[in-house]
Amino acid sequence: MIKEAIKIQGTKEGLVIVLEEDVDIETLKEKIVNRIEKSLKFFEGATLTVRVKSLSVKEEKLQELKDVIFEKYGIEVRIKNFQEKHIKNVTDDEIFNGLEEGITKFHKGTVRSGQVVKYHGNLVIIGDVNPGGLVQAAGNIVVMGTLRGIAHAGFTGNKEAVIVASSLRAMQLRIANVISRAPDKDDASDYPEIAVVKKGKIIVKPLYHLNDLW
């Protein structure tokens, strides 16, 4: 039995599939194909990097895996670190370490009360986030509408993540493990604002003050 044989992570280099130690490549091939079949839109246009944590996996088998994925789905696959003795894991520090980095998901429509939209990358909401709605991203969050619910950016621990909204009236803001209370009613603004972590606290500034934050 393979325990967590496949881990899919979003990083600066795109989607990364991590293959665990002592794996059966045929079983992995089947599992990867099944994962892609279940989430075709998620993988559409993506670049896949396969990181191998075991040198027991033969290179020709990995090439076969690349060929199968490319022939079936047109997805380019890169094999990384195959010849290295010590394979470096993808860590949270590698994931979305800046405002301009990382893969992005676009969610079209209103996020309603009780609804959760979560993504291991940057997340753009084209619509509003209603009270009781929750949006979570490993990277940055941009709401092209009114943010009235809860937004949690950098949920993997990235304090460099930001939250941006056309109108920021959130019930709660979270960046990594830092939490901010809802703004007072009189403080709510109708112009775009950005929330960042500074000195261990979340601060909110007008978006046109962006250059003052760095």
Curated annotation (Swiss-Prot):
GO terms for biological process: cell morphogenesis; division septum assembly; regulation of cell division; regulation of cell septum assembly. InterPro entries: CAP/MinC_C, MinC, MinC_C_sf, MinC_N, Septum_form_inhib_MinC_C. Pfam families: MinC_C, MinC_N. Keywords: Cell cycle, Cell division, Septation. The keyword Cell division applies. Cell division inhibitor that blocks the formation of polar Z ring septums. Rapidly oscillates between the poles of the cell to destabilize FtsZ filaments that have formed before they mature into polar Z rings. Prevents FtsZ polymerization. Belongs to the MinC family. Interacts with MinD and FtsZ. This is Probable septum site-determining protein MinC. It comes from Thermoanaerobacter pseudethanolicus (strain ATCC 33223 / 39E). The gene is minC.
